[in-house]
UniProtKB/Swiss-Prot annotation:
One of its GO terms (molecular function) is potassium channel inhibitor activity. It is found in: Secreted. Blocks voltage-gated potassium channels. At 2 uM, blocks rat Kv1.1/KCNA1 and Kv1.3/KCNA3, has a strong effect on rat Kv1.2/KCNA2 and Kv1.6/KCNA6 as well as a moderate effect on Shaker IR. Has the structural arrangement of an alpha-helix connected to a beta-sheet by disulfide bonds (CSalpha/beta). The keyword NADP does not apply. Expressed by the venom gland. Disulfide bonds join C29-C49, C35-C54, C39-C56. It comes from Olivierus martensii (Manchurian scorpion). This is Potassium channel toxin alpha-KTx 3.6. Residues 1-22 form the signal peptide. Negative results: has no effect on rat Kv1.4/KCNA4, Kv1.5/KCNA5, Kv4.1/KCND1 or human Kv11.1/KCNH2 and Kv3.1/KCNC1. Has no effect on bovine KCa1.1. Does not inhibit the growth of Gram-positive and Gram-negative bacteria. Its main location: secreted. The modification Lysine amide is found at K59. The lineage of its organism: Eukaryota, Metazoa, Ecdysozoa, Arthropoda, Chelicerata.
Length: 60
C-alpha cells in the first residue's frame, strides 16, 4: 500500500510539472481531442482543453 501511495504522489507531481510548462494558444475547444492537431501544428507535443481554450505542452 505504501508503494502504491508513493507511485500515486510521484505521478501527481510529474503531471503538475508538465502542466506548469503549458502554453496557451488561441483555439477554442470543448474537449482535449480538439487540441491535438492545433498543438502539433504549433510545434507542440501534447494538448489539452482547459477552460475552453487549448493548452499545449512544448517539445523537450
Amino acid at each position: 500500500m505504501k508503494v502504491f501511495f508513493a507511485v500515486l504522489i510521484t505521478l501527481f507531481i510529474c503531471s503538475m510539472i508538465i502542466g506548469i510548462h503549458g502554453v496557451g494558444i488561441n483555439v477554442k475547444c470543448k474537449h482535449s481531442g480538439q487540441c491535438l492537431k492545433p498543438c502539433k501544428d504549433a510545434g507542440m507535443r501534447f494538448g489539452k482543453c482547459i477552460n475552453g481554450k487549448c493548452d499545449c505542452t512544448p517539445k523537450g
